[in-house]
Amino acid sequence: MLQIGEFSRLSRISVRMLRHYDQVGLLKPAEQDAQTGYRRYAASQLAEANRITVLRDLGFPIREIGRLAHADDGELARALDDRARELEEGIGREQRRLADLRRFRQEVE
């Protein structure tokens, strides 16, 4: 078992975020000492922590990560495809804004 600090170092998730993930039920420690409250994680939970980190980095909200953390590959693939479409739409909007900005800038001269 890994204490929270060691798990934090290995997973690259801050202790504060691990506590938050525990509170919201996203990543529960394998065990927690009833007297001290110390959290201990199993090494096998590092894969789950990695999936959570990747999904966070891709912009998924915590609520959806909770659903996807244990999803099968098909459900995860659909969610990733949906997120890719959202990002592409956002990029398109930003490109249009940039074009508008450049046109406006030329008018200022």
What is the predicted function of each stretch?
Residues I65-R67:
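Phosphopantetheinylated carrier protein domains
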Residues T53, A69-E109:
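Short, charged amphipathic alpha-helical surface segments
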Residues M1-R63:
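Basic helix-turn-helix/winged-helix DNA-binding cores
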